[in-house]
């Protein structure tokens, strides 16, 4: 099954955070928070403006983005946990 977001929504797959500190201490799953960065795997057509025009999104598939801890709606597709959110919930793109 594939999910196609509508309008200005994007689908993000969370990226795993480091589970070991710089000093070598392993952080258990119970002490870690959900990662607030992820890779965009699908984007909608764009934001519909008041005059009816459609503005293309500033992000694209493959971008790694930062987003708020409580952004979007979590969904499960084919056993994978994904987050569907509006482009406005994205704080920035991580450039390599």
Curated annotation (Swiss-Prot):
<protein>
    <recommendedName>
        <fullName>Co-chaperonin GroES</fullName>
    </recommendedName>
</protein>
<comment type="subunit">
    <text>Heptamer of 7 subunits arranged in a ring. Interacts with the chaperonin GroEL.</text>
</comment>
<dbReference type="GO" id="GO:0005524">
    <property type="term" value="F:ATP binding"/>
</dbReference>
<dbReference type="GO" id="GO:0046872">
    <property type="term" value="F:metal ion binding"/>
</dbReference>
<dbReference type="Pfam" id="PF00166">
    <property type="entry name" value="Cpn10"/>
</dbReference>
<dbReference type="InterPro" id="IPR011032">
    <property type="entry name" value="GroES-like_sf"/>
</dbReference>
<dbReference type="InterPro" id="IPR018369">
    <property type="entry name" value="Chaprnonin_Cpn10_CS"/>
</dbReference>
<dbReference type="GO" id="GO:0051082">
    <property type="term" value="F:unfolded protein binding"/>
</dbReference>
<keyword id="KW-0143">Chaperone</keyword>
<dbReference type="GO" id="GO:0044183">
    <property type="term" value="F:protein folding chaperone"/>
</dbReference>
<keyword id="KW-0963">Cytoplasm</keyword>
<comment type="function">
    <text>Together with the chaperonin GroEL, plays an essential role in assisting protein folding. The GroEL-GroES system forms a nano-cage that allows encapsulation of the non-native substrate proteins and provides a physical environment optimized to promote and accelerate protein folding. GroES binds to the apical surface of the GroEL ring, thereby capping the opening of the GroEL channel.</text>
</comment>
<dbReference type="GO" id="GO:0051085">
    <property type="term" value="P:chaperone cofactor-dependent protein refolding"/>
</dbReference>
<dbReference type="InterPro" id="IPR037124">
    <property type="entry name" value="Chaperonin_GroES_sf"/>
</dbReference>
<dbReference type="InterPro" id="IPR020818">
    <property type="entry name" value="Chaperonin_GroES"/>
</dbReference>
<dbReference type="GO" id="GO:0051087">
    <property type="term" value="F:protein-folding chaperone binding"/>
</dbReference>
<keyword id="KW-0346">Stress response</keyword>
<dbReference type="GO" id="GO:0005737">
    <property type="term" value="C:cytoplasm"/>
</dbReference>
<comment type="similarity">
    <text>Belongs to the GroES chaperonin family.</text>
</comment>
């Amino acid at each position: 099954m594939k999910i196609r977001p509508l309008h200005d929504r994007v689908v993000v797959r969370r990226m795993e955070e480091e589970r070991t500190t710089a000093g070598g201490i392993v952080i258990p799953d119970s002490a870690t928070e959900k990662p607030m960065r992820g890779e965009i795997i699908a984007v909608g057509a764009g934001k519909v403006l008041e005059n009816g025009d459609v503005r293309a999104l500033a992000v694209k598939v493959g971008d790694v983005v930062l987003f708020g801890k409580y952004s979007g709606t979590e969904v499960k597709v084919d056993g994978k946990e994904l987050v569907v959110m509006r482009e406005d919930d994205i704080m920035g793109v991580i450039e390599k």
